[in-house]
């Protein structure tokens, strides 16, 4: 195995272990000392991969976003794709909520992470385009007049709200089984388009959303060219 591959493998192990420690802590923060101890590495070795703890956190979030993107790229049926969109949050509610909290904190206070945030947003925009294709395709298959924008927003709202419920030990005392709640929420989202019969109008929202994403991507590329 080459030294480059060894370095890459070690970095992946660092990210996976740091993610697990974050989830176990539940507070959105860990110490590099505890991470180094868990990995049986010198603390200085961590700095060969990440210049700061904030950079480590953001790299974990980028890795998570890449995993979501790869799941959304599965090409089977649009209904299965829509179901996966919701389940991504409902199956790992703690991770979805915690990583969003960490990202918001980094965006508000961290310094020197503009390039990495640009990388994160590019991956997210690519995933957004895939989600738009899935939701638009499902709406068409259901002959629905619901707009892509409204359907996406509802899916995210239900996913985020459902994740909050599933992550709450207090509300879980009253909500019963987690698996039946997940099934109910997914089924609600699959049934929603049928409540909006088609009026034979084109879904301009889909085109607008794609154009907006493309414009943001072009602006990001131009800003990178200017800064370099």
What does each model-identified segment do?
Residues 1-25, 29-38, 55:
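Basic, helix-initiating cap at the start of DNA-binding domains
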Residues 29, 52-57, 67-68:
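Short amphipathic alpha-helical segment with a characteristic S/N-K-E followed by hydrophobic residues
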Residues 37, 51-52, 62:
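Residue-level detection of the helix-turn-helix DNA-binding "recognition helix"
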Residues 39-50:
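Short hydrophobic/aromatic patch on the recognition helix
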Residues 59, 70-97, 145-148, 152-155:
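Hydrophobic alpha-helical connector segments
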Residues 92-118, 164-168:
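Amphipathic alpha-helical segments used for helix-helix packing
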Residues 111-142, 149-154:
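Amphipathic alpha-helical packing segments from all-alpha helical-bundle domains
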Residues 133, 137, 161-228:
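C-terminal peripheral helix-coil segments that are non-catalytic and often amphipathic
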């Amino acid at each position: 195995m080459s030294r480059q591959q060894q370095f890459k493998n070690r970095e992946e192990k660092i990210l996976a272990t740091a993610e697990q420690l974050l989830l176990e802590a539940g507070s959105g923060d860990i110490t590099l000392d505890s991470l180094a101890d868990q990995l049986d590495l010198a603390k200085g070795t961590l700095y060969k991969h990440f210049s700061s703890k904030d950079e480590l956190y953001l790299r974990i979030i980028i890795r998570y976003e890449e995993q979501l993107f790869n799941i959304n790229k599965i090409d089977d049926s649009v209904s299965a794709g829509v179901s996966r969109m919701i389940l991504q949050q409902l199956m790992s509610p703690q991770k979805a909520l915690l990583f969003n909290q960490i990202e918001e904190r980094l965006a508000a206070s961290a310094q020197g992470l503009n390039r990495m945030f640009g990388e994160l947003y590019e991956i997210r925009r690519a995933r957004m385009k895939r989600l738009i294709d899935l939701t638009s395709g499902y709406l068409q298959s259901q002959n629905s007049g619901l707009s892509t924008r409204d359907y996406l927003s509802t899916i995210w709202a239900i996913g985020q709200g459902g994740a909050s419920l599933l992550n709450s030990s207090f509300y879980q005392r009253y909500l019963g089984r987690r698996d039946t709640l997940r099934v109910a929420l997914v089924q609600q989202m699959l049934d929603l388009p049928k409540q909006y019969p088609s009026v034979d109008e084109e879904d301009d929202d889909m085109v607008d959303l794609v154009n907006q994403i493309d414009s943001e991507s072009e602006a990001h590329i131009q800003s990178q060219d200017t800064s370099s």
